[in-house]
A protein has these predicted regions:
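An accessory alpha-helical subdomain
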Residues: 177-181
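Core alpha/beta nucleotide-donor-binding catalytic domains of modification enzymes
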Residues: 1-146, 150-173
């Protein structure tokens, strides 16, 4: 589906899962002229989330975009990793909204498939999960970077995504990004 068709397919009012990263900044800008947006930011209760919140807060304030913030509420079960717990909490927060769009892209799909296959359970990111929609799954991350660079938009990088000691980050940097660049 081309981007013009996508604009007309989405509802007029929608919520963007907004982290302040390049993908979510690009889709906020892309959708902003044709849709009534609300930004949904999830605070994980960490210093990294504090810095991300500052960026997201000022971005939304400067553009007049309503911002809704969710916070960690539940204790992490012993059988859950932190990453899994945070993801579950984020999706629980996003259930509060009628129609949510995320910035998941092709790189995310490939990374998730490789990582999950290495753990014996290969999965593909679905384009829809309840009220959460991922219309950009066929677009490589570079599309979002190019969009932001062409529009002189700034975004924030999450430093926790670059530490190679985590297998998912290693896959992202050394397999996916090298193959798609």
């Amino acid at each position: 589906m081309d981007m013009i068709q996508l604009l007309h397919k989405l509802p007029r009012k929608l919520t963007v899962a907004f982290s302040g990263g390049v993908d979510s900044v690009a889709i906020m800008d892309f959708l902003g002229n044709n849709h009534e947006l609300t930004a949904a930011f999830f605070h994980h209760g960490t210093d990294v989330s504090d810095h991300a919140y500052d960026f997201v807060h000022f971005y939304c304030r400067d553009r007049g975009i309503p911002l809704k913030v969710g916070y960690m509420r539940d204790q992490k079960p012993k059988d859950e990793s932190w990453e899994e717990h945070w993801r579950n909490q984020r999706y629980k927060f996003l259930e509060e909204f009628e129609y949510v769009v995320t910035g998941h892209h092709l790189n995310d799909c490939i990374e998730t498939y490789i990582w999950s296959a290495m753990h014996g359970n290969p999965i593909v990111i679905p384009d829809t999960r309840k009220n959460v929609h991922r219309p950009f799954l066929l677009n490589p991350k570079q599309t979002f970077i190019d969009w932001c660079n062409n529009k002189n938009l700034s975004w924030r990088e999450d430093w926790t995504n670059v530490d190679d000691k985590y297998m998912r980050n290693y896959i992202r940097k050394n397999v996916v990004e090298q193959r798609l660049s």
